[in-house]
Amino acid sequence: MAISKEDVLEYISNLSVLELSELVKEFEEKFGVSAAPVMVAGGAVAGGAVAAAEEKTEFDIVLTDGGAKKIEVIKIVRALTGLGLKEAKDAVEQTPSTLKEGVAKAEAEEAKKQLEEAGAKVELK
């Protein structure tokens, strides 16, 4: 005997709030989905405030100071960007300079870590 949609709905309607919450969590885990409400594009001004609160996913790596160990920083800049020696040297000496744009968060944080370990000052925007 097959279970109909009506049977499922009837069963769910008889669950307590706690049982329903546990059921939702199990659905999320089993099917890899989220029960978070879907945001609709556009709308009132409040929608813009919510969008600003969302976590940024792309970053620009901006070198604000080359630091004292410029040769090490230039080597790292070349490795990160693929620039030639002269271009990398100019980027390190003429700060602030944007090294990369639209970079994923993990890559941006790793680049910042490498540059700061070499003595440079970096901002992620």
UniProtKB/Swiss-Prot annotation:
GO biological process terms held by the UniProt record: translation
Gene Ontology cellular component annotations, sorted alphabetically: cytosolic large ribosomal subunit
InterPro entries in UniProt: Ribosomal_bL12 (IPR000206), Ribosomal_bL12_C (IPR013823), Ribosomal_bL12_C/ClpS-like (IPR014719), Ribosomal_bL12_oligo (IPR008932), Ribosomal_bL12_oligo_N_sf (IPR036235)
Pfam families: Ribosomal_L12, Ribosomal_L12_N
A Gene Ontology molecular function term of the record: mRNA binding
CDD domains: Ribosomal_L7_L12
The entry's keywords: Ribonucleoprotein, Ribosomal protein
Signal peptide feature range: none
Family annotation (HAMAP family): Ribosomal_bL12 (MF_00368)
Family per similarity comment: Belongs to the bacterial ribosomal protein bL12 family.
Classification via NCBIfam families: L12
Biological function: Forms part of the ribosomal stalk which helps the ribosome interact with GTP-bound translation factors. Is thus essential for accurate translation.
UniProt cross-references to PANTHER family, sorted A to Z: 39S RIBOSOMAL PROTEIN L12, LARGE RIBOSOMAL SUBUNIT PROTEIN BL12M
Subunit structure: Homodimer. Part of the ribosomal stalk of the 50S ribosomal subunit. Forms a multimeric L10(L12)X complex, where L10 forms an elongated spine to which 2 to 4 L12 dimers bind in a sequential fashion. Binds GTP-bound translation factors.
Protein name: Large ribosomal subunit protein bL12
Species name: Campylobacter jejuni subsp. jejuni serotype O:2 (strain ATCC 700819 / NCTC 11168)
Gene coding for it: rplL
